[in-house]
Amino acid sequence: MVWAWQQWLSPRPQKRTKNTSQVAFYTSENAALYEPLSKPDGNWYVRETHFRENPNVRAGLTGPPLHLHLQQDEYFKVEQGVLGAVKDGVEVAITKNDPVLHIPRGTRHRFWPHPSSTEDLVFTAWADPCKDHDHILDLNFLRNLAGYLADCDSEGLQPSPFQLILFFHEASSILCPPFLNWMPLWLLIWVHNGLAWIAREFLG
């Protein structure tokens, strides 16, 4: 049972979309398509397609907020269009002619469809390590996050910061919103863990 004060502090959709059985799944308003794929060695990667006809894609709003991963390196390879990215405060625009973008663990970063692109953005992304570890960025995290955001959007709700922090915490990742991004990493981790504990223990 969800109490009124929990709903007030952390609004949640009344209906949750089940996307675990879907081979591929869409984000809010079908702005982007996630296609989980497998490598010959059994590791996974994701092909993301961000559709330029969607106004949120043209505005560069379909990427994640600034964040970092504590246990994994992350990699991006563009197949079509232009990917914008920030890596430790340095902004770049990447095309298929550029090498793989490597984001070492602990690096603050974000990515989005770059406004200079004139076509759909298509890129692949993967993390290392990507299996045999608990509490890492994996396909369950991507499905849960995409489904939650889409459900919030369909019901006209603002996503709960506490829920987002808990999602990232369970994937050994840290959100870096502006009011926290000034912190050194050790303090940011401490605050993030505290907020995730509140979300898990008190907000249901």
From Swiss-Prot:
Null mutant phenotype: Abolishes the production of iso-A82775C, but accumulates pestalodiol E.
Pathway: Secondary metabolite biosynthesis
Induction trigger: Expression is co-regulated with the other genes from the iso-A82775C biosynthesis cluster and probably controlled by the cluster-specific transcription factors iacI and iacK.
Molecular function as annotated in GO: oxidoreductase activity
InterPro entries: RmlC-like_jellyroll, RmlC_Cupin_sf
Record keywords: Oxidoreductase
Keyword set includes Oxidoreductase: yes
Gene3D superfamilies according to UniProt: Jelly Rolls (2.60.120.10)
Top class in the EC scheme: oxidoreductase
Enzyme Commission number(s) from the entry: 1.-.-.-
Record's description of how this protein is used: Iso-A82775C is a precursor for the biosynthesis of the anticancer natural products chloropestolides A to E via a Diesls-Alder reaction with maldoxin. In the absence of the prenyltransferase iacE, siccayne accumulates instead of iso-A82775C and can also be condensed with maldoxin to produce chloropestolides H to K, which show also antibacterial and anticancer properties.
Family membership noted in the UniProt record: Belongs to the oxidoreductase OpS7 family.
Task performed by this protein: Oxidoreductase; part of the gene cluster that mediates the biosynthesis of iso-A82775C, a enylepoxycyclohexane and biosynthetic precursor of the chloropestolide anticancer natural products. Within the cluster, the prenyltransferase iacE prenylates siccayne to generate pestalodiol E, using dimethylallyl diphosphate (DMAPP) as cosubstrate. The probable oxidoreductase iacF is then involved in the epoxidation of pestalodiol F to pestalodiol F, which is further converted to pestalofone A by the short-chain dehydrogenase/reductase iacG.
Protein name from the UniProt record: Oxidoreductase iacF
